Regions:
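Phosphate-bearing ligand-interacting subdomains
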Residues: 49-109
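N-terminal amphipathic/basic-hydrophobic helices that include classical n-h-c signal peptides
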Residues: 1-11
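A solvent-exposed beta-alpha-beta segment
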Residues: 10-75
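Short alpha-helical
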Residues: 22, 84-85, 115
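Short amphipathic alpha-helical segments
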Residues: 28-30, 55, 88-92, 134, ...
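Short, basic/aromatic-enriched C-terminal tail that caps enzymatic domains
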Residues: 61, 65, 215-229
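Structural signal for interior beta-strand "rungs" in well-ordered beta-sheet cores
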Residues: 102-216, 220-223
Length: 229
């Protein structure tokens, strides 16, 4: 199936990964496994277009040209780990009335009563246990897990091997670094990670994290000049 841009081309199925960074290139094989008979491509904003027109053998076109393609089924998944950028791109896609597709690895495990919103990426060897709500555009990188009775907001990023234990609420646009652990909260007193916060790699979070705060260490504490001494 040939991609030509600009122009309007009728296609049956086309799935696009927005982004061409390392994570996007890791996610593409998962998408191919999930949708082997579809046309799977990379897209970026036109100002970030590469000189080549393909990456790892997959077509690359601008988002602006992708919008012009006429297809019975056209989907986008945003594979950009930066939560603020992902939120802006998501709004752009919604304004174009294009569906955001979830990509879920066959080697991941999802248990009972798990609600997953649109545009989610669940990488290999991720576990979602029971009674969990997952917000739009959540990224769970390899070997991460979300345990029981957790609520995950929109545009949340789990780097590899993040461990979110039970009774935790993670608000929108939170980035959690590789190997971070969030201690289990209580049913009547969950641990809350505030919106737009950052949990540094290897941190052990034992209590609430305020909005727009960066924490690090074991136990996790607010990153400041005094705590770095």
């Amino acid at each position: 199936m040939e991609i030509k841009a600009p122009g309007r081309i009728l296609m049956s199925m086309i799935n696009a990964i927005y982004g061409t960074g390392g994570f996007a290139r890791e996610v593409m094989p998962i998408l191919k496994e999930q949708c082997p008979n579809d046309e799977n491509i990379f897209i970026v904003h036109k100002k970030y277009m590469h000189t080549q027109n393909s990456i790892n053998g997959y077509p690359l076109i601008s988002y602006e040209d992708f919008v012009k393609i006429s297809s019975k089924d056209k989907n986008v998944t945003i594979a950009i780990s930066d939560t603020a950028i992902r939120s802006k791109v998501s709004d752009q896609i919604d304004n174009s009335h294009i569906k955001q597709k979830s990509i879920v690895s066959k080697t991941s495990l999802t248990m009972d009563n798990v609600s997953i919103s649109d545009g989610v990426i669940i990488c290999p060897f991720v576990t979602l246990t029971s009674n969990i709500s997952i917000g739009k555009n959540f990224h769970a990188n390899i070997y991460s897990y979300v345990a029981h009775d957790c609520i995950i907001g929109e545009n949340v990023t789990f780097a590899p091997s993040v461990k979110c234990n039970g009774n935790v609420i993670i608000e929108d646009n939170v980035f959690i670094g590789t190997g971070a652990i969030i201690k289990q909260g209580k049913k009547d007193n969950p641990i809350v990670i505030g919106a737009n916060s950052i949990i540094s790699a290897g941190s052990f979070v034992t209590r609430n994290v305020s909005k727009s705060t960066t924490v690090f260490g074991n136990p996790a504490r607010v990153l400041s000049k005094s705590t770095l001494k």
